[in-house]
Amino acid sequence: MMSSYSTRRTFFAFIATLAFSLAPATAQDARRGYVPPARDTVRAVAADHGMMVAQERFSAQVGADILRRGGNAVDAAVATGFAMAVTYPRAGNIGGGGFMVIHSADRNEDITIDYRETAPAATTPQIFLGADGKPDATKSRDSALGVGVPGTVAGLALALDKYGSGQFTLAQLLAPAIALARDGFIVSDDIADTLPSWHRRLARWPSSAKIFSRPDGTPLVEGDRLVQGDLAETLSAVAALGPRGFYEGEVAEKLAKAVTDAGGIMTPADLKAYRPVIRAPVRGTYRGYDIVSMPLPSSGGVVLLETLNILEGFQLADLKQGSPASLHLLIEAMKRAYADRARYLGDPAFVNAPIETLIAKDYAAKLRAGISAERATPSKELVSASAAPREGSNTTHFSVVDGRGNAVSNTYTLNFSYGVGLVADGTGVLLNNELDDFTAAVGASNAYGLVGFEANLPGPGKRPLSSMSPTIVLKDGKPVLVTGSPGGSRIISTVLQVIVNVLDYKMDVAAAVATPRLHHQWLPDEVRVERGFPDDVLLALKAMGHLIVEPMGQTSANSILVTPSGLLGAADPRTRGAEAAGQ
């Protein structure tokens, strides 16, 4: 156990440096909008012994420090996951949930941990309908009815218990997060830019306003210090008692009271009953590589594999990356897989989805046969039904690889930025509005335009369908690429394009991440595109019948490529403050 006085002293000096000395590095006038850099100007960060890539620099350094001190990829992931609850409050969390994919080199095993939020026991299929029987989006998005039972604390603790190195206790891995919450850190330009848009939402509750506001009631600005004393106490309770410090006792009582006082239905019994689930990953192959991703209740792995299977029948390498012909095939493959997502997928505890059929090569061949090389297929010709719920894009993803070949791909979320906006008084915990990912009614869409069917209706104890797609690509049983992204429904298409860019087009991982992306999710029948595609390419896609819409929306595919000569980390340049930290 690494617990000597000198190790602790060095460690807390490191945290103090993070909290007090790291100033935002991005210029204010370069903040707004993503303009893809020239491909020859982006560079991956190289390392020999370990790599952490995360959407926020303080937390990336926390994970890298754990690797430096002999921890494995899971140890580092747990430390970073808790730290991001402090330093990246719009998505990092202990009041939400997510998914983790682990490759254990020591055990030659691939596993996943589902720590998705669950619906409280009092949830009914009609909970998000108005008096007229139609979906009322304000109930799931803007009220405490949308709060699901958080899973992050239980999920991260389970990962450490089952797959950590054994060199660190949970309390040791929580120490960086506790220090950052207690002592505070300098507000970054990213936090300062997002707060004005969400401050009115946060300010509905005094418990939230007092944390994210200046004394005059205006949002914190870049250079202010964000101190979260109550959150430090909550994290300390978890350090002392493990998950019981969150799911039982004083913290649980405060969480439940905050929700019920705000009109929600989560109770202390719901919190005590929460359990994360270890699941076998969904697996497939693409161009001779093994793709390991998240199974249901995340749709990510299934839709990703279905899309890759469709594309495998086309020789994409013979088409120029970013050409109209290659992009058309990507769009058409996405369209078909997302249509199946809406029709079939939901919580596996409640829905018997035809997964083996959906990820079968022969099924992909049938779908591929319906793709014209010259003409866009109207979405209405694929399935005669309505679309799936819109998911929150304010998720966050980090990737980790250690020197022994262990790898972690982790995506977690509050759904919207800052979740529902409610900090449970006395806990510092920002609560999610994740239940908006359920289908409020058959055919209704959620906040991100995804349409759903009966499989994803709300129900007690049920986990809402997700698009989170933490993924590890293997060759001969060893990690080659670790990737994932935030972005709601755009997560799957983002991960898809990173994989295709690396495996088909042999792009450097930094360029594969930075290059412009597009997205189609079946309904609405439109192609969302980032800036950076040449006008002639967009005109050619329009001529094929594609409706082109800008912008695509935020994604951040923080990725690691494992090469014979070492590790290459690519922090997505779309996110200010993202960092690849190697050692």
PLM feature spans:
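Bacterial N-terminal signal peptides that target proteins for export
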Residues: 1-14
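Bacterial N-terminal signal peptides
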Residues: 12-23
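Noncatalytic scaffold domains of N-terminal-nucleophile
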Residues: 28-61, 73-241, 246-248, 253-299, ...
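Alpha-helical support elements that line or immediately flank enzyme active sites
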Residues: 66-67, 154-162, 241-248, 253, ...
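Active-site rim segments in enzyme catalytic domains, especially the processed small/beta chain
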Residues: 86-112, 265-267, 406-475, 505, ...
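Short beta-strand scaffold segments in enzyme catalytic cores
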Residues: 92-93, 97-104, 396-400, 470-472, ...
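Internal maturation/activation junctions in enzymes
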Residues: 207, 213, 313-414, 423-427, ...
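Extended C-terminal subregions enriched in glycine
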Residues: 441, 462, 504-552
